[in-house]
Amino acid sequence: GKLKKIRWGILGAAKIAREQVMPAMINSESTELVAIASKDLKKAHFLGKKFNIPKIYNKYEDLIKDPNIDAVYNPLPNHLHVPWSIKAAKEGKHVLCEKPISMEGSEIKELINTELNTGKKIVEAFMVREHPQWHKAKSMIDEGLIGEINAIQGMFCYHNIDPRNIRNDPNIGGGGLLDIGVYPIVTTRF
């Protein structure tokens, strides 16, 4: 039979959600965008109209309590990843959380315990782990087609000098290392 579509709720109106994830979701046969929550209600209404999302919330709490949502996408600022992912799972939702899933290693145990106690998946959204180009590169390395790895040098950068940008505030975004430094680290471990 036909697979049931996963009904998604989006927490916030982050750029990654607006420009990458939500467009991908509306083009997928297995997903349905059913709700968005943003503290900026004007932005939520705009995105609701743009992506044909029927429910608009101005409180994250209301979205995660919606019984018509199966899974939540969490692209909130980094310091909010753990608390809102846990709250969503405790409300019976699976969670796809943007990277880094936490700002402290000690928070990972709490995420794992929440998964075990709720039976809901909490997964970190990391393009490196799922993109076909990286799978191809990994298989070429595994098959010995491009030699043996002896050392890895990685660099990932962008120009962002706006002091108001969350990526530049170590207290809420973790600073450059947690925001983009994770890419070369995760890629080498992949």
Predicted regions and their residues:
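N-terminal Rossmann-like dinucleotide-binding module
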Residues: G1-F51
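Beta-loop-alpha module in the N-terminal Rossmann-like domain of NAD(P)-dependent dehydrogenases
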Residues: F51-T114
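Predominantly a Rossmann-like dinucleotide-binding segment in NAD(P)-dependent oxidoreductases
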Residues: V128-F190
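Alpha-helical elements of Rossmann-like donor-binding domains used by nucleotide-donor carbohydrate transfer enzymes
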Residues: Q20, F46, K59-D62, A71, ...
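Rossmann-fold dehydrogenase core element
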Residues: K109-M127, E148-I152
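Short active-site oxyanion
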Residues: T31-A35, D70-V72, G174-G175
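Glycine-centered tight turns that cap/initiate beta-strands
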Residues: S30, N52, N68, L145-E148
